[in-house]
Regions:
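Conserved Lys-Pro-Asp/Glu-containing loop-to-beta segment of HAD-superfamily phosphomonoesterases
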Residues: 160-192
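Glycine-rich phosphate-binding loop signature in dinucleotide/nucleotide-binding domains
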Residues: 2-5, 120-122, 173-180
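Substrate-recognition element of Asp-dependent hydrolases with the DxDx(T/V) motif
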Residues: 92-96, 100-106, 111-142, 148-154, ...
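N-terminal helical cap/lid subdomain that shapes the substrate entry/recognition surface
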Residues: 4-109
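Short acidic capping loops at alpha-helix termini that bridge into adjacent secondary structure
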Residues: 86, 146-150, 177-182
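Structural motif
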Residues: 197-198
Length: 198
């Protein structure tokens, strides 16, 4: 059991924990669909969310590549809502989505207030499986980067959560021991169990 009096550093996941990925993704898809003149049914996001989560779990287990994830999550969603679209258009949507996602930077309600409270008491850090450049822009454009001493992503660490290597990389970067650290995230397996395996 962790003795919270000994905690000096708090590590956060970014997407779905601080950064409201679902809201920002919906706004981005709406923009992309409009730009491409696609009349996609309004239930797209309802089906995209669980499909996206499924593929992120496979990516974390190294069963698929990030490139495959970007295509498959869209292809499966379009099939689920019975919307006909070519593979070429799916690839274009996937590319435009990544390019435009950081135009929207909503965080969860209360996130800034919590970080303001914590920043004077602890060293704060990010551990994310998201792509380096995209995550960097999310932090910058949402004005979150001011709160974090270090940012570890899977590209830098050479491993994705729940792999112990990404947590060890983050701890080394922060120069802190596991017993003085706390991990906060939305995914029990990737964030919490992964951190407990250190």
């Amino acid at each position: 059991m962790t003795d919270f009096k000994n905690i000096t550093d708090i590590f956060f996941d970014l997407d779905h924990t601080i950064y409201d990925f679902d809201k920002n993704a919906e706004l981005t898809f709406n923009q992309v669909f409009k730009d491409l003149n696609l009349n996609v049914p309004s239930n797209f996001m309802e089906h995209f969310k669980p499909i996206n989560d499924y593929y992120w779990d496979l990516l974390a287990k190294k069963e698929i590549t990030a490139e495959y994830l970007r295509f498959a999550r869209l292809n499966d969603t379009f099939q689920k809502i019975d919307f006909q679209v070519s593979n070429e258009v799916i690839n274009e949507i996937a590319s435009l989505f990544i390019e435009n996602l950081t135009n929207y930077n909503h965080v969860f309600e209360g996130a800034y207030e919590i970080l303001d409270y914590l920043k004077d008491k602890y060293q704060l850090h990010i551990i994310t499986n998201g792509p380096d450049k995209v995550q960097e822009l999310k932090l910058k454009n949402s004005n979150l980067n001011q709160y974090f001493c270090t940012v570890t992503n899977s590209e830098l660490a050479g491993a994705k959560k729940p792999d112990a290597r990404i947590f060890k990389y983050a701890l080394n970067l922060a120069n802190v021991k596991p017993e003085h650290s706390l991990m906060i995230g939305d995914n029990l397996d990737a964030d919490i169990k992964g951190a407990l395996n250190i």
